[in-house]
Amino acid sequence: MPKTKLILTEPDVAPLIGSNNIQKRNSDGSAAESHPSWNPHPIQGWTTDFIPLVLQEAIDEKYYDELIPVSGDDGIFWSTELAKKEGIITGVSGGSTFAIAIKVAKKAKPGSNILCMIPDTAERYMSSILFDSIDSEMNNEEIDLYKSV
C-alpha cells in the first residue's frame, strides 16, 4: 500500500532500534545477551531487553517508515487523559501508543487516516505508577454523581 506508513515507537530511555547498536545473536538467531541500549522504563509490556529475530528481520528490510521514541511520562499523561476525556481505560503502553499517534496526527496531511491500536485495559495496573495521583476513595462530588445515576 503506497500511501500506508508504518510508524515504530520505543521507550526513549531504551532505544534498542534507535541506537543502531547490534543485537548479539546465537547461531540459531536467538539473542545471545541483553541489548546494550536496554534500560528499565515504565512502559510495561514494551521493549524487552533484546530485539527478537523477527523484528530484526523487519528492521533490516526497512519495513517501517519512521521511528519515534516516547517517554514514559508522555505515556502516563495520555493514558490518564484517555481515561478522563474518552472513557478509554488503558495502561502506560496504550497511552504511549496514543502519544505517538497524536504526534503523527499533528504533522499529517489534512484528510489522513491514522490507526492507533490500544490492545489492553488498565485493570492490571491499579497498583502501578499510573494510578498514583488517583485517590482510592470517592470524594463528595463523585459520591453525588454516583447517587444520581
Which positions does each model-derived feature cover?
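Buried hydrophobic packing segments
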Residues: 79, 97-105
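Surface-exposed, flexible loop/turn segments at secondary-structure boundaries
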Residues: 14, 122-123
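Catalytic phosphate/nucleotide-handling subdomain of diverse soluble enzymes
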Residues: 102-119, 126-138, 145-147
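Active-site/ligand-binding loops adjacent to catalytic centers
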Residues: 1-92, 129-149
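Short glycine-rich anion-binding loops that position phosphate/pyrophosphate groups of nucleotides
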Residues: 95, 120-122
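Ser/Thr-glycine-rich phosphate-binding loops at phosphate-binding pockets of nucleotides
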Residues: 93-97, 114
